[in-house]
From Swiss-Prot:
This is Homeobox-leucine zipper protein HOX29. Probable transcription factor that may be necessary for the proper patterning of vascular bundles. Residues 169-397 form the START domain. Residues 64-106 form a coiled coil. It comes from Oryza sativa subsp. japonica (Rice). Residues 150-171 are annotated as: Disordered. PANTHER family: HOMEOBOX-LEUCINE ZIPPER PROTEIN ATHB-14 (PTHR45950), HOMEOBOX-LEUCINE ZIPPER PROTEIN ATHB-15 (PTHR45950:SF1). It comes from the Eukaryota. InterPro entries: HD, HD-Zip_III, Homeodomain-like_sf, MEKHLA, START-like_dom_sf, START_lipid-bd_dom. Residues 9-72 bind DNA. It is found in: Nucleus. Belongs to the HD-ZIP homeobox family. Class III subfamily.
Length: 868
């Protein structure tokens, strides 16, 4: 017994020699979890392991994997602890700044109270007119409303500004140094002081996984944003990246360093000229003439601050450049200091006056929004730094074997090409073609942008397009969620795109491409979204779209699938100031990094408060909504059950500007034809987008207090309200039994809807068309198909069944139409993502409406289904 225990202990606890450990470690790094055969092979190859029990070798690998897992977990926790420590220190600093701000406000309030009391004591000595004026001034001084605080604070700042306004300086180094030091002082007072009243940006809460502390200005001149965060990079590298604004700010068209002057120890003064693209066709682009001052503070912090140079400050001037509007950058910049736990702590301030008077009133809120500045500039800088730091700390290979830097370059290329076409600046070679005056579609041509000077595709054939034409327009959207609209456009390209034009895009990549196609909507055999990458912050996706081309255009040219490189961002619906974009460009199958791109797409910018996001899933049957009566009747609730919906819409009304731009490569002699085709195509797209936006807007109109099922299927149309009742009545008529035992003819529509929605079997309704498509499914049906009600319309009946199921369907379909019902044996169906699901039995019946008894749709019920 004792000998047996000793033998057991000997096999359980083994002391390995250094040679044995080296051999085991070598295999571990090759294969952390070797099979039994691989372990036996190791014993044969390494004589040092010959006397080790094979079971003990298995135990060693188990222990080694466990130690590695513990090491990684310990490392992760230590890194998280360091990050939390640094974040806590940052929050304590922010708390100190807020305490100073509170003290300043208390002091100002007391000073105003003393002044008001003095005025009250002097009132009896005033004449009646003077007393009235003093009373008005007192009311202004003691009013604590938002308007009064903002206005009085603004005037107070103006008075202070007038008092401390220095005399104009010249363009000498001493004059520029004086401007730089003043800029540094004002910037630091904003970054770490109380010069600006900062409010936490809506939807941005600090935490270990947050991007940082984001704040926007309140009651100051212009628009301003402030960001504080931690980045795992050295201060010098952070400054190098942030100073290269075109690298991370996609709206930056160019930034030229006109002059550089030394300033003190390790300091520099730079004169910069910067141009920013306009985000929409409704406003001109902006430019800035700046002084930038880089220096190191006494505590070792690195600071880079900048401001506009104008007649107020003196210094050198820059002539106005047409068609740009000269904006003003108030003291801004970034403060970088080393963190105690490694990396850097960054304070970013962006403070601008974007001259909102120069744009139409409808888009003026874009230029008066501090949240927009925070999203597009301050947070963009932090996101870019976090992305680069994440890539530097680990080896990252993303989709299709590309490095993250190459994918960032592709995203930048897409955005820059879209912005360039959207702005259509003359120095880029763009000229505007005279409009026909029918609508607001603008056509511009760039004949200097020859896509084929040196470029060739994988076939070795050159790209021969001799010019590029851009059709662009902007439109106002109301009561629709920008992310939801772009998501629908992304997932349902067939609802708005023209397959013939996609084929034409492909043909422009070939030499000797022929005549223009006739524009027609649809013709797709399907699309496949191939994920390529997404940024470290999950708000942007880069993907390749594979379009199965079912077009009859130039079949000899297009005997292959079409590919689009696509970028989709702005997916967070609750973030204030978020800009949503869907930008794509045709690419060759080789997908080389230097391939020319002609980006087209959509950009939606909210211009007031976002929609209520309590019901983010739009689950109304979109197909029936699109085919229903006039949009006004749906929105106003004329067709029954819409009074509460209209009220909800009014309470959550929001507006957004959608900008659409499409580029077309063409040969010189086809310019007029391409222009006419592009104009008509743009009109078709605008019409489709308006139709989809109205449907999505209607689908959000859920009355307050409605149940979960009602929120999933809003009764905006009579069909949506009564379809579940028709399903149950038709089932009772054909099968002589109740589909749902708990409801009867006297039950309300809402109770029947809930019962059908939560039925355990998958219930699906399809249209009575030559190619039946699904129009409704309950929750179980959506789970089985792995889709949503909005996406359901793109699924045809025959694609749900496997081969045997399609044969059974073809056999039973005539019986369903003639007899009104059919029962089918168990089989297999396929979800929208290709996953197989088996079902025990399926029944089908014809659903008739409750009025005239006409056939409305066919309903299928899959019983006891499960994924294989």
């Amino acid at each position: 017994m004792v000998a047996s225990a000793a033998a057991m202990d000997a096999s359980k606890y083994v002391r390995y020699t250094p040679e044995q450990v080296e051999a085991l470690e070598r295999l571990y790094y090759e294969c952390p979890k070797p099979s039994s055969l691989r372990r036996q092979q190791l014993v044969r190859e390494c004589p040092a392991l010959a006397n080790v029990d094979p079971k003990q070798i298995k135990v060693w690998f188990q222990n080694r994997r466990c130690r590695e897992k513990q090491r990684k977990e310990s490392s992760r926790l230590q890194a998280l602890n360091r990050k939390l420590t640094a974040m806590n220190k940052l929050l304590m600093e922010e708390n100190d700044r807020l305490q100073k701000q509170v003290s300043q406000l208390v002091y100002d309030h007391g000073r105003h109270g003393v002044a008001a009391a003095g005025m009250m004591r002097r009132v009896p000595a005033f004449p009646p007119q003077a007393a009235a004026a003093a009373g008005h001034q007192l009311a202004t001084a003691t009013d604590t409303s938002c308007e009064s605080v903002v206005t009085s604070g603004h005037h107070h700042q103006q008075q202070q500004h007038n008092v401390v306004q220095p005399p104009p300086r010249d363009a000498s180094p001493a004059g520029l140094m004086s401007i730089a030091e003043e800029t540094l002082t004002e910037f630091l007072s904003k970054a770490t002081g109380t010069a600006v009243e900062w409010l936490q940006m809506p939807g941005m809460k600090p935490g270990p996984d947050s991007i940082g502390i984001i704040a926007i200005s309140h009651g100051c001149a212009g628009v301003a944003a402030r960001a504080c965060g931690l980045v795992g990079m050295e201060p010098a590298k952070v400054a190098e990246i942030l100073k290269d604004r075109p690298l991370w700010l996609r709206d930056c068209r160019s930034m030229d360093v006109v002059n550089v002057l030394p300033a003190g120890a390790n300091g520099t003064i730079e004169l910069l000229y910067m141009q920013l693209y306009a985000p929409t066709t409704l406003a001109p682009a902006r430019d800035f003439w700046l002084l930038r001052y880089t220096s190191i503070l006494d505590d070792g912090s690195l600071v880079v601050c900048e401001r506009s140079l104008s007649s107020k400050q003196g210094g050198p001037s820059m002539p106005l450049v047409q068609p740009f509007i000269r904006g003003e950058m108030l003291p801004s910049g970034f403060l970088i200091r080393p963190s105690d736990v490694g990396g850097s702590v960054i304070h970013i301030v962006d403070h601008m006056d974007l001259e909102p008077w120069s744009v139409p009133e409808v888009v003026r809120p874009l230029y008066e929004s501090s949240a927009m500045v925070a999203q597009k500039i301050s947070m963009a800088a932090l996101r870019y730094l976090r992305q680069v730091a994440h890539e530097d700390t680990r080896s990252v290979i993303t989709g299709w074997g590309r490095q993250p830097a190459a994918l960032r370059a592709l995203s930048q290329k897409l955005t820059r090409g879209f912005n360039e076409a959207l702005n259509g600046l003359a120095d880029d070679g763009w000229s505007v073609i005279e409009s026909d005056g029918v609508d607001d579609v603008c056509i511009s041509v760039n004949s200097s942008k020859v896509i084929g000077c040196n470029a060739t595709f994988s076939s070795g054939l050159p790209i021969v397009s001799t010019g590029v034409l851009c059709a662009k327009a902007s439109m106002l959207l109301q009561d629709v969620s920008p992310p939801s609209l772009l998501q629908f456009l992304r997932e349902h390209r067939s609802q708005w795109a023209d397959s013939n034009l996609d084929a034409f895009f492909a043909s422009t990549m070939k030499p000797n491409f022929c005549n223009l196609p006739m524009s027609r909507l649809g013709g797709f055999s399907g699309q496949v979204i191939l994920p390529l990458a997404h940024t470290f912050e999950p708000e942007e996706f880069l993907e390749v779209i594979k379009l199965g081309n079912a077009s009859n255009y130039q079949d000899t040219l297009v005997h292959r699938d079409l590919f689009l490189l696509q970028m989709y961002n702005g997916v967070e619906e609750s973030s204030a100031g978020t800009c949503s974009e869907l930008i794509f460009a045709p690419i060759d199958a080789s997908f080389s990094d230097d391939s020319p791109l002609l980006p087209s797409g959509f950009r939606i910018i909210p211009i007031d408060s976002p929609l209520d996001t309590s019901s983010p899933n739009c689950t109304l049957d979109l197909a029936s909504t699109l085919e229903a009566a006039t949009p006004r009747s749906r929105i106003s609730g004329v067709n029954g059950g819409g009074g509460g919906c209209a009220a909800a819409a009014a309470s959550s009304s929001s507006k957004a500007v959608m900008t659409i731009a499409f580029q077309f490569a063409f040969d010189g002699h086809l310019q007029d034809s391409v222009a006419a085709m592009a104009r008509q195509y743009m009109r078709n797209i605008i019409s489709s987008v308006q139709r989809i936006a109205v449907a999505l807007s209607s689908s959000r109109l859920v009355p307050p207090g409605a149940g979960a099922a009602a929120a999933q299927l809003s009764p905006v149309t009579p069909e949506a309200a009564t379809l579940p009742r028709w399903i149950c009545q038709s089932y009772r008529f054909h099968f002589g039994d109740e589909l749902i035992k708990s409801v009867d003819a006297n039950s309300s529509n809402e109770s029947i809807l809930k019962a059908v929605w939560h039925h355990p079997s998958a219930i699906l309704c399809c249209s009575l068309k030559a190619m039946p498509v699904f129009t409704f499914a309950n929750q179980s049906g959506l789970d089985m198909l792995e889709t949503t009600l909005v996406a359901l319309q793109d699924m045809t009946l025959e694609k749900v069944f496997d081969d045997q199921g399609r044969k059974n369907l073809c056999t039973e379909l005539p019986n369903i139409m003639e007899q009104g019902m059919a029962c089918m044996e168990g089989g297999v169906c396929v979800s929208s993502v290709g996953r197989a699901a088996s079902y025990e039995k399926a029944v089908a019946w014809k659903v008739v409406d409750g009025d005239g008894g006409g056939a409305h749709c066919i309903c299928f019920m899959f019983i006891n289904w499960t994924f294989l």
